[in-house]
Amino acid sequence: MNFNNRQDLINDIREWASNDETSYRNWIRPTIIFSAGSDLSYFDCISEWQKTIPVIAARYFSCMGLPMSINQVELVLTDEDVEDLANGLYDDYEEEFEETRARYHPDRYPDDAERFGIGTGE
């Protein structure tokens, strides 16, 4: 964990979050389900991701032996850091988001529904 190199810290949190089952189950998957089910625009999706970043980062720091509250995380991470993490995690889970969105709204996203075999009996 390197607080001096912001990009390394962001990359570490992103990689860790992508591999942490608890973060996925408690924050990442619910964010995907909410965003896809609500059929949010890209910018609204990023806004939802930004809301989860402080919680995920607090868990990251705690697992790294540096327990922090969400308020403390917000002092460590800049708005730009949170935005970078939100964009990165969205990118990591974009395909899962598209599949979930197609399951909720196959009529609005027929190409995605077909791509994921939704409603085709496959």
Feature names for model-found ranges:
Residues 1-122:
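Acidic interaction surfaces
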